[in-house]
């Protein structure tokens, strides 16, 4: 039976929710980012002589990274930070990553290598590195990433300045490969969406996750939550929630830059996003009990938003399918989608310029923003399909349990023959002619579309009409009154969001900001690490003392046998 044959009230209600959720969330992200930038992102240069910089351990988990790991270690070895060690862990790679690491250990004094022939996943590799680390502060980066020279200073400073309660500090990932259509879209996504989200979440007081590609941990904090979860596919999301539930603070430091490679194929991007969504959903299942504890209330907004995101994704796909194939009111649906596309496109353009204000300080990427200012619209569509695809995987993974092992990621098609200065982190990609042509056509079409949107918006606000505008408005079923309605509501919701977040920030500062509930913890001792019952005394001593150590089997106690 046609569910819309009796009345289109259901269509209107569901359609309104589907439209207003991404619209309101985008406005909230913009408001939160502005507040964060004003209070915590003012330009400043670190006085390197002001602090007594503690020694740090830089951890590099590796799996099938033979093409990238040497460059990463070379860059790490030349950092200006006064005292650090590098610990690279090969987690059962099927290529020659282990051999390369052992050779590099002979070349670089700061490098220590753990070569485990059994693949047990990234979290397990981090367990090995944490037991091998000699210092209290751990900086973890991906083995294809390049750490900016000033990044360790910015990360560590967060622990030193009123950071007694800080358990982790997440940095600001930047994209190295930015030539292909897919990599350019991700470049815009990280800056105009992910960057705004992280800033807003910090205003709320909690974050959904650290960035696994660049994050600094306090070892004492990690030990208090039994390190990383080895049975969840996204160990960075999992440990973020564990730390925050133990009342450790997680900070976002956008000045700590790390340059990474991103997927350049549709399948690679799809697999990455499904993995992220699956990990987020596994966290939702695992931490459903936070509503039983009033002390966890600052995590509630993050949790609720994640649940609503899942429900929205399912609703959007179901709504779209039903309205296309069964709805009686196809004309109304056409008008709805036309207006929604226009509204979200205009908001994407505004979001673009706000993100430019924040991100242009760190990376000259304005030309990419103009090129793909329309991407936030597609972000919501892509995310809907990703969330729905990941849902059964996360349910099955939660039921089955076991190690969350990793697969070889898509790092793009990098031109390794390209010569570049040591301070240039971006790289060229090997593109086929077809890919270049497709990217150019998409660029031309979407640029023209965004021009129409902006032109239509300005003319609607000013009440201007001509023959061209009339044709466009008629085709899109939009009137000047619709545009004015949209403009006024955008302003109202932005002001309301700004005020709510501003008051929330003041409350957080007064209620939590100056509390001294936890004195600066002492450095983690050997006895404390052994108390986790993950390695025996002999293995711990080997991990601490050997420059290169090889394990045929996993030295970390198996899942199910801990404590």
Model-found features: residue ranges?
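A conserved acidic beta->alpha catalytic loop
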Residues: 82, 90-99, 118
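Acidic helix N-cap motif at the loop->helix transition within catalytic regions
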Residues: 70-71, 95-104, 150
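Long helical/loop segments within the catalytic core of UDP-sugar-dependent glycosyltransferases
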Residues: 35, 109-115, 123-125, 129-131, ...
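Short, acidic, metal-binding catalytic loop of nucleotide-sugar glycosyltransferases
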Residues: 74-83
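Juxtamembrane C-terminal module of membrane proteins
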Residues: 31-55, 289-302, 326-425
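N-proximal low-complexity "stem/linker" segments adjacent to membrane-targeting elements
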Residues: 1-74
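Cell-envelope/extracellular polymer assembly enzymes that use nucleotide-activated donors
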Residues: 54-57, 85, 238
């Amino acid at each position: 039976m046609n569910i819309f044959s009796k009345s289109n009230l259901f269509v209107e209600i569901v359609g309104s929710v589907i439209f207003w959720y991404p619209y309101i969330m985008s406005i909230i992200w913009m408001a939160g980012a502005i507040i964060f930038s004003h209070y915590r992102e003012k330009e400043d240069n670190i006085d390197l002589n002001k602090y007594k910089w503690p020694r740090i351990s830089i951890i590099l988990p590796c799996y099938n990274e033979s093409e990238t790991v040497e460059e990463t270690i070379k860059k790490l070895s030349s950092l200006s930070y006064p005292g650090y060690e590098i610990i690279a862990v090969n987690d059962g790679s099927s290529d020659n990553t282990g051999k390369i690491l052992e050779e590099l250990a002979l070349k670089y004094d700061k490098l220590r290598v753990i070569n485990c022939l059994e693949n047990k996943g990234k979290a397990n590799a981090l367990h090995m590195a944490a037991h091998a680390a000699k210092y209290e502060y751990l900086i973890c980066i991906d083995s294809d990433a390049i750490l900016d020279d000033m990044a360790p200073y910015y990360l560590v400073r967060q622990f030193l300045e009123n950071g007694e309660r800080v358990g982790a500090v997440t940095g600001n990932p930047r994209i190295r490969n930015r030539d292909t259509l897919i990599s350019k879209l991700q470049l815009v996504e990280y800056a105009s969406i992910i960057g705004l989200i992280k800033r807003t979440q910090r205003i709320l007081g909690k974050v959904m996750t650290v960035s696994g590609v660049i994050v600094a941990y306090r070892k004492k904090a990690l030990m208090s939550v039994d390190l990383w979860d080895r049975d969840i596919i996204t160990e960075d999301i999992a440990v973020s929630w564990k730390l925050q539930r133990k009342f450790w603070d997680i900070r976002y430091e956008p000045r700590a830059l790390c340059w990474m490679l991103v997927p350049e194929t549709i399948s690679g991007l799809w697999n990455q996003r499904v993995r992220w969504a699956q990990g987020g959903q596994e966290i939702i299942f695992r931490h459903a009990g936070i509503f039983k504890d009033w002390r966890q209330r600052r995590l509630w907004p993050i949790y609720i938003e994640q649940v609503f995101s899942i429900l929205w994704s399912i609703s959007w796909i179901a709504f779209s399918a039903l309205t296309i194939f069964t709805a009686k009111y196809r004309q109304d649906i056409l008008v709805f989608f036309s207006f929604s596309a226009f509204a979200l496109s205009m908001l994407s353009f505004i979001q673009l310029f706000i993100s430019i204000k924040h991100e242009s300080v760190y990376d000259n990427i304005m030309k990419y923003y103009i090129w793909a200012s329309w991407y936030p619209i597609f972000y919501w569509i892509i995310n809907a399909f990703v969330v729905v695809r990941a849902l059964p995987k996360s349910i099955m993974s939660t039921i089955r349990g076991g190690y969350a092992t990793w697969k070889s990621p898509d790092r793009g098609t990098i031109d390794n023959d390209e010569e570049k200065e040591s301070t240039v982190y971006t790289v060229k990609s090997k593109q086929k002619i077809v890919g270049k042509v497709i990217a150019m056509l998409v660029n031309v079409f979407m640029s023209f579309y965004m021009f129409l949107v902006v032109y239509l918006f300005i003319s609607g606000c000013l009440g201007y009409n001509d023959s061209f505008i009339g044709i466009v408005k008629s085709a899109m079923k939009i009137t000047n009154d619709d545009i004015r309605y949209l403009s006024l509501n955008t302003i109202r919701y932005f002001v309301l969001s700004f005020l709510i977040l501003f008051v929330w920030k003041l409350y957080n500062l007064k209620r939590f900001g100056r509390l001294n509930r936890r004195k600066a913890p002492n450095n983690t001792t050997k006895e404390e690490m052994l108390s986790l019952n993950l390695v025996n005394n002999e293995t711990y001593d080997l991990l601490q003392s050997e420059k290169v150590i090889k394990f045929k089997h996993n030295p970390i106690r198996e899942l199910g046998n801990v404590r």
